[in-house]
Amino acid sequence: EATALMNDTAKAAAAAMKSFSKMSSAESSATCLKCHEGSQGNAEERFNYRRSEHARHGVSCNDCHSSHAPKRTEFLLKNTEPNLCYTCHAEQKASFSKPFHHKVPEGGMKCSDCHNQHGGFMGKSLRNSVNGDSACVKCHADKQGPFVFEHAPIKTEGCQSCHTPHGSTNPKLLTRNLVRFLCIECHSNTPGLPGEPLGDQTPSSHDINNPRYQNCTACHIQIHGSNVDRRFFR
């Protein structure tokens, strides 16, 4: 009797897999969402899936999860992160191979630590931190503020105005190879007058051609924001 029951279960599973294989992406996901959608648990995880980047590009639940024979038992995933993500996002694998990168290949963090693979409500499917700021400040809380003197690009454009999120050939994941090149993208031909943005007109005692004065952050050390100095000296 037990053997017959197991055979019936196997047949039912095979029939289910066959029927899923014939479904469109939207149809198969709709079947999953009959149970896996709504306010139970972490609603952000699945509630926005129908409007997510994955859903809009035809990625179904079955592309990442295997309900009957998963390679990974955790979340029934077909593969581990980041290899599962690299199936589609191959360009990011190249980014993580650069000399400076977030420790995703080493297993120090996962793609899903920053991105909500089921949608979420932030751009680029980023996860919202507890207090509503970007995914970055969950780890880099000391850069968050609020500060008495804010560095405007951080508030208006975010961390990616200076940093690349996945990997870079530049230290600190900067978008430019030298700090001064990054700074003069904004601070160029602007006089450093009181109440005005700081400019590239350095004091006469600071010869900008001297390597000693070419690293802006040697003096402007609190570049993310300061509570005591509008010039970010401290």
Segments the model singles out, each with a brief description of its role:
Residues 1-234:
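Short sequence/structural segments immediately N-terminal
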